Amino acid sequence: MALSFVFITCFMILLDTSQSCHTPDDFVAITSPGHIMIGGLFAIHEKMLSSDDHPRQPQIQKCVGFEISVFLQTLAMIHSIEMINNSSLLSGVKLGYEIYDTCTEVTAAMAATLRFLSKFNCSRETVIFQCDYSSYVPRVKAIIGAGYSEISMAVSRMLNLQLMPQVSYESTAEILSDKIRFPSFLRTVPSDFYQTKAMAHLIRQSGWNWVGAITTDDDYGRLALNTFAIQAAENNVCIAFKEVLPAFLSDNTIEVRINQTLEKIIAEAQVNVIVVFLRKFHVFNLFNKAIERKISKIWIASDNWSTAAKIITIPNVKKLGKVVGFTFRRGNMSSFHSFLQTLHMYPSDNNKPLHEFAMLFSACKHIKDGDLSQCISNYSQATWTYDTTKTIETHLFKRNDFLWHYTEPGLIHSIQLAVLALGHAIRDLCQDRDCQKPNAFQPWELLAVLKNVTFTDGKNSFHFDAHGDLNTGYEVVLWKETNGLMTVTKMAEYDLQHDVFITTNQETKHEFRKLKQILSKCSKECIPGQMKKATGSQHSCCYECVNCPENHYSNETDMDHCLVCNNETHWAPVRSTMCFEKEVEYLDWDDSLALLLIALSLLGIAFVLAVGIIFTRNLKTPVVKSSGGLVVCYVMLACHALNFASTGFFIGEPQDFTCKTRQTLFGVSFTLCVSCILTKSLKILLAFSFDPTLKTFLKCLYRPVPIVLTCTGIQVVICTLWLVLAAPTVEENTSLPRVIILECEEGSALAFGTMLGYIAVLAFICFVFAFKGRKLPENYNEAKFLTFGMLIYFIAWITFIPVYATTFGKYLPAVEIIVILISNYGILCCTFFPKCYIILCKQKTNTKSVFLQMVYNYSAHSVDSLALSHVSLDSASHSTATTNPRPGNKTAACQNYKHLPVQVLAHTGMEKTMHASKTLHQKRSSSI
């Protein structure tokens, strides 16, 4: 581009220094004089003929391929200028125009621009080189055009030299918003930034993410594709392929590239949506070949061709699938429609395109409407000579309102806005100047006013933004077949500011919904409960769907990541679409195990009551008296009842009160029970003890009330400190995946262990004392049963420790309940059931005489054993005394002992036995 500019500059200097040249009138397409001249650049022909000269000479070649739609655009400019001239907007000032055909070539556009920049009213028509163009008066004051962005860029760089205003009606390349590189460029259409943003939004909203893109190899095509790629990525849309076609039809490779593009489309079977940034003649050739290959897709049309009648009228175009396009917002077209109906009365002597159209139309009048435009386009202008005196046939322009069907409303409205903007800017500039003079103002002055002008089209108000753009918005159009003909229908409007599509009625909303029925995805859609996992492809849209793991969920389609549930309060299974609240669990009253434990506790309480009744009714019997009396029995039975009742605090929803009560109630009541058993064990051991030393010690130790109060008091202190320093509290255990365990946190494991350990110490002492007195009379064998009871307690609680440590969940309290029940039942049964059995089933043995006889027999047996042990000791002493003087004579002593009379031993033992028996009998009788 820089080399081109140097070449142009040198070319302009040569023009200035060379001999004056002839005015190239044949290069001007349309002209009309005026006080203020406006230039126009339109691609009336689709291409320029290539030169066969070798070497090629610097000549402007003739153009072919008459474009009816662009011809209508030139008429729109003429009509808009005449509307201003016929209005009071510019009082006494007439706008003139010079319109040139660019032939879709930058070279022709630059040649026309050189003429625009040439000095006004100079016979030599040269561009004078100056360092300061502030007072330079060029041939025109402003330019409308060009249509294609690449041409506008080249022209704008030339116009920057004089800061001549250039207002484009169609160039949408985003780079043209850069006022540093293009300071004199303005446009009455939005930037491609908004169009590509709208396209990406439409694609995402329709549920597509795998699309193709086709563009031209020029500044417009490359910039549009890059901008769309950025917008697509932001909307999670991937471009499967990008095909680039030569920018000009004169390129010999264009047919090959079109075929390659179609082969790519066929190969990418999953791509059902294709975005097309092409010129009209590219799309025309592409679609004709696509119809031959029976390719049916959704085509996203850019504003370049979305309403082009030349393409809409392609035979069998409906076989291509759906075409959804973006076009500029339209305005009031009634005045222009009337202008077209009277076009035959318009003089054609200064309007070569009009005359050419009339001749081409006449030559193709035998062609039906569907092929008429193609016929006109295929005729070569090179075969025609213009006879401006020939009368234009009126009926040709009225044939089914032919020209009106080729009108592109969005572009026509943009041209009207461009002329209106210039008209209002000139009005503001000419308020204090005589604008009938050619040097009334310079182009750069008009540019300054134009940037800030506010104007109206009769309905809406407009002004250029800081980038020189007129953000009028877009219309979304859909090609639909109506009565056998393809028509363009408005589907929605796109609001640039809020990035939303605005539908006007239910029918258009239905059309939007129908688009979603077509799939264009690289991978199958991940349903809720799944997430996308990359497969190694460079495209993020290509993935595989994997299920969300446990405690994760996805509630939308095609989610990149599964969302995490709050593990403390919620959970989710594999492939979940939502989080579920964790169920709060605890050992409830209606639980089957809880019901069983409650029944056992109630049964235990019933047993306690039954024992209490039995003992109360048999209060004066020896069995009850030997048990310590009714007070001790009632205290123990009450403790057992409290132990059974304490299990109820382990069931049901945990509360602070129940958590604090259950352990302390059990601990204190069980300690009181064991303390009573301890006193009973001491009493039994004391009653049947024959060792004087042990008896003396036990008499000092045996203090029932202090023992019970002291032992129980220590446990009360332990529990009180526990409740004060680290009381049990309710805790939500959230470590399980699907439930919240509502449980009592004991507060202090040390305090809990101390409480249980203290009971164990007391139980062990009871066990020792009971074990010492286990060999009592058969009917008085309470110590043996107490030993069994303590063994049951130890076995239960030793088992409890590992089970409690390894059990988890709502049944953890049940473990302690079971242990409490086992130990409580064990002690209750071993302590009271044998006595109840004697009371109820062996009433004959529950008398004082039987008990006295039993005690007497046991005492006699015990004394006999004691006497025998004394005889043995005496014999041993005598033998020792005999042998001591002669240590070596031990055998003789033993032989002497053997010959002692048996009667002597028996007599000695009998005397001692009778004395001990009487004494022991008196002691046992007093206890009964």
Curated annotation (Swiss-Prot):
<feature type="signal peptide">
    <location>
        <begin position="1"/>
        <end position="20"/>
    </location>
</feature>
<dbReference type="GO" id="GO:0035774">
    <property type="term" value="P:positive regulation of insulin secretion involved in cellular response to glucose stimulus"/>
</dbReference>
<dbReference type="GO" id="GO:0004930">
    <property type="term" value="F:G protein-coupled receptor activity"/>
</dbReference>
<keyword id="KW-0732">Signal</keyword>
<dbReference type="GO" id="GO:0005886">
    <property type="term" value="C:plasma membrane"/>
</dbReference>
<keyword id="KW-1015">Disulfide bond</keyword>
<keyword id="KW-0675">Receptor</keyword>
<keyword id="KW-1133">Transmembrane helix</keyword>
<feature type="transmembrane region" description="Helical">
    <location>
        <begin position="751"/>
        <end position="771"/>
    </location>
</feature>
<keyword id="KW-0297">G-protein coupled receptor</keyword>
<comment type="function">
    <text>Receptor activated by multiple ligands, including osteocalcin (BGLAP), basic amino acids, and various cations. Activated by amino acids with a preference for basic amino acids such as L-Lys, L-Arg and L-ornithine but also by small and polar amino acids. The L-alpha amino acids respond is augmented by divalent cations Ca(2+) and Mg(2+). Seems to act through a G(q)/G(11) and G(i)-coupled pathway.</text>
</comment>
<feature type="topological domain" description="Cytoplasmic">
    <location>
        <begin position="616"/>
        <end position="630"/>
    </location>
</feature>
<keyword id="KW-0807">Transducer</keyword>
<dbReference type="GO" id="GO:2000224">
    <property type="term" value="P:regulation of testosterone biosynthetic process"/>
</dbReference>
<dbReference type="GO" id="GO:0019722">
    <property type="term" value="P:calcium-mediated signaling"/>
</dbReference>
<dbReference type="InterPro" id="IPR028082">
    <property type="entry name" value="Peripla_BP_I"/>
</dbReference>
<dbReference type="GO" id="GO:0008528">
    <property type="term" value="F:G protein-coupled peptide receptor activity"/>
</dbReference>
<feature type="glycosylation site" description="N-linked (GlcNAc...) asparagine">
    <location>
        <position position="332"/>
    </location>
</feature>
<keyword id="KW-0325">Glycoprotein</keyword>
<feature type="topological domain" description="Cytoplasmic">
    <location>
        <begin position="834"/>
        <end position="928"/>
    </location>
</feature>
<dbReference type="Pfam" id="PF01094">
    <property type="entry name" value="ANF_receptor"/>
</dbReference>
<keyword id="KW-1003">Cell membrane</keyword>
<comment type="similarity">
    <text>Belongs to the G-protein coupled receptor 3 family.</text>
</comment>
<feature type="transmembrane region" description="Helical">
    <location>
        <begin position="785"/>
        <end position="805"/>
    </location>
</feature>
<protein>
    <recommendedName>
        <fullName>G-protein coupled receptor family C group 6 member A</fullName>
    </recommendedName>
</protein>
<feature type="glycosylation site" description="N-linked (GlcNAc...) asparagine">
    <location>
        <position position="555"/>
    </location>
</feature>
<comment type="subunit">
    <text>Homodimer; disulfide-linked.</text>
</comment>
<dbReference type="GO" id="GO:0007189">
    <property type="term" value="P:adenylate cyclase-activating G protein-coupled receptor signaling pathway"/>
</dbReference>
<dbReference type="InterPro" id="IPR000337">
    <property type="entry name" value="GPCR_3"/>
</dbReference>
<feature type="transmembrane region" description="Helical">
    <location>
        <begin position="631"/>
        <end position="651"/>
    </location>
</feature>
<feature type="topological domain" description="Extracellular">
    <location>
        <begin position="21"/>
        <end position="594"/>
    </location>
</feature>
<feature type="transmembrane region" description="Helical">
    <location>
        <begin position="813"/>
        <end position="833"/>
    </location>
</feature>
<dbReference type="InterPro" id="IPR000068">
    <property type="entry name" value="GPCR_3_Ca_sens_rcpt-rel"/>
</dbReference>
<feature type="topological domain" description="Extracellular">
    <location>
        <begin position="652"/>
        <end position="669"/>
    </location>
</feature>
<dbReference type="InterPro" id="IPR011500">
    <property type="entry name" value="GPCR_3_9-Cys_dom"/>
</dbReference>
<dbReference type="InterPro" id="IPR017978">
    <property type="entry name" value="GPCR_3_C"/>
</dbReference>
<feature type="topological domain" description="Extracellular">
    <location>
        <begin position="728"/>
        <end position="750"/>
    </location>
</feature>
<feature type="topological domain" description="Cytoplasmic">
    <location>
        <begin position="691"/>
        <end position="706"/>
    </location>
</feature>
<dbReference type="Pfam" id="PF07562">
    <property type="entry name" value="NCD3G"/>
</dbReference>
<dbReference type="InterPro" id="IPR017979">
    <property type="entry name" value="GPCR_3_CS"/>
</dbReference>
<feature type="transmembrane region" description="Helical">
    <location>
        <begin position="595"/>
        <end position="615"/>
    </location>
</feature>
<dbReference type="GO" id="GO:0043200">
    <property type="term" value="P:response to amino acid"/>
</dbReference>
